[in-house]
Amino acid sequence: MNQNFYSMIDRYKHQQLRIGPVSPQQISAWANKILPNGEVVGEVTKPYTFHYKTNKPEKDGLFCERIFGPIKSGICACGNYRVIGAEKEDPKFCEQCGVEFVDSRVRRYQMGYIKLACPVTHVWYLKRLPSYIANLLDKPLKELEGLVYCDFSFARPIAKKPTFLRLRGSFEYEIQSWKYSIPLFFTTQGFETFRNREISTGAGAIREQLADLDLRIITDNSLIEWKELGDEGSTGNEWEDRKIRRRKDFLVRRMELAKHFIRTNVEPEWMVLCLLPVLPPELRPIIQIDGGKLMSSDINELYRRVIYRNNTLTDLLTTSRSTPGELVMCQEKLVQEAVDTLLDNGIRGQPMRDGHNKVYKSFSDVIEGKEGRFRETLLGKRVDYSGRSVIVVGPSLSLHQCGLPREIAIELFQTFVIRGLIRQHVASNIGIAKSKIREKEPIVWEILQEVMQGHPVLLNRAPTLHRLGIQAFQPILVEGRAICLHPLVCKGFNADFDGDQMAVHVPLSLEAQAEARLLMFSHMNLLSPAIGDPISVPTQDMLIGLYVLTIGNPRGICANRYNFFNCKNDENAPLDNDNYQATKEKEPHFSSSYDALGAYRRKRIRLDSPLWLRWRLDQRVIIGSREVPLEVQYESFGTYHEIYRHYLIVRSVKKEICSIYIRTTVGHISFYREIEEAIQGFYRAYSYAS
């Protein structure tokens, strides 16, 4: 691999990959290599693969050993063998066939290129929505497509020179369209001279317009127009207002695209190809199966189609002098369509098929989707220190915790447990430690608990479409074989508990653990990175639970028309369905929330049973209230009780407030205590941070 490619991969000692347009010089630098005799190879000029008699790669073909390296390590096309890396004065390549004596693995990354006879537009940047080329040129996509596929031409502005196109105004009528009539007047060379002088068509016209763009001027002009449209305000016409909004959205996209090109040092004309890269042979193999038959990648056939058409166009432009110009335009269109099919088959309509009516897999089909090169081969590989299981709800977990089954945890942290067993002199070597783990001795689980306390794990749910698709958690040992997850983090993962699976990974290096703790913990990712809205919000089951918890008894206070102090409530008598009808009117009173929760745990009251709870309420709130009591009950000792809708006041003979009771339920008490603990915990954390 050449030094330029190495510098891209190994920059700053980190492996990185950037996908985007590249210059023709960069493509040439990736593909070209200089042999020890000074010859430069890298261009693929022939559409052949292997010779049908010798089964050897054709020279300058799609599997040429001079361009891509030897098929067998250290063996050239002639059959000579040299020891790889031997420091001798012998040349490192065969002087007869020009093949270098290198490792055959070079065929996995050594690229080639096809020198196109005419510029070709990259179909990804033309046809994919939004069209980058149409955005930058500010022209309709249909107009650009007609220009690319030679359906019409642009006239070049030539000042103070007689032009053939000015004759168009001399005719009163036209028998044919000028698109078809102009090429009929010229031979090949004459048409090329005319086209280069007066008209512009094909991808070359797109390339010229992109090369003339100034991205900074585009950004400034788009911003000025956007501000002018914003200052105009509403016109009162719904159709016109919609057109203005669409235009403003287009200007924003255009500015963002231009800024991205400036930031990444990409020139707009690179979206039009002059050199077509050829993939390494090992990525598009030809395999021989039983019976001597060959199986080839579809990309090889698409490359052959491009080379055939490109060579035909080259012959028309260089050798033939009497070919009509119309034929040249038609051949350029065929080259453009062949490259489109190679890059993205079917993007322009009907896909290309083979003799068995099977659609060819283009480059886009190979890399995109769930079974593509990235998601299946590169990102979907199994890795060490990872596991996978179904997720279930863990309502008792904290937001930053996850429940890890014992079977998964002991496998993930086995090396750490072995080290702990040896350090504590429980086992003398690795073999004994593994046997203790297999026997599941109690000391194993104790050491596993210690290891897991300071080691976060990463949970990932595919597809990982944004950064919240993988988050860090503190693992907790649980029984069973399913991973327990807090329900509040499901929205970030786009997960639910209907059979979804998640993968668990163990960060090993200190850098990875620090990143997990500082950036990836679930309780530190409460907001959506896209729009900033809260993403850890109660949904579905949690909302239903909160509703049931706080619904209370709908009968209201008017159902109780007696002094609650006269009700004798046996604290030890459990409440069942049989005697509930007889006792449900008796609303008990409690001096603290702990007593109320204790009575609920003893099944003395229900979750929604109304009760009176003594409460420390600011008397100024009571005095300032203008609410009239629903009922006043007097005691024999002179004290009396003012019963309001939601609270009750006990006053002395001197009308002083002795105590205040509020009417609530166990559900409200539980909910209040949870909120109170959360606020206090937040306050303590904030005070500690300050």
From Swiss-Prot:
Keyword Zinc set for record: yes
Binding positions (Mg(2+)): 496, 498, 500
Species name: Lemna minor
EC number per UniProt: 2.7.7.6
Name of the protein this chain belongs to: DNA-directed RNA polymerase subunit beta'
Details of cofactor binding: Binds 1 Mg(2+) ion per subunit.
Alphabetized Gene3D superfamilies for the sequence: 1.10.40.90, 2.40.40.20, RNA polymerase II, clamp domain (4.10.860.120), RNA polymerase Rpb1, domain 3 (1.10.274.100)
Recorded GO CC terms: chloroplast; DNA-directed RNA polymerase complex; mitochondrion
Keywords, comma-separated and alphabetical: Chloroplast, DNA-directed RNA polymerase, Magnesium, Metal-binding, Nucleotidyltransferase, Plastid, Transcription, Transferase, Zinc
Obligatory cofactor(s): Mg(2+); Zn(2+)
Subcellular location, record wording: Plastid, Chloroplast
Gene that this polypeptide is encoded by: rpoC1
UniProt GO MF annotations: DNA binding; DNA-directed RNA polymerase activity; magnesium ion binding; zinc ion binding
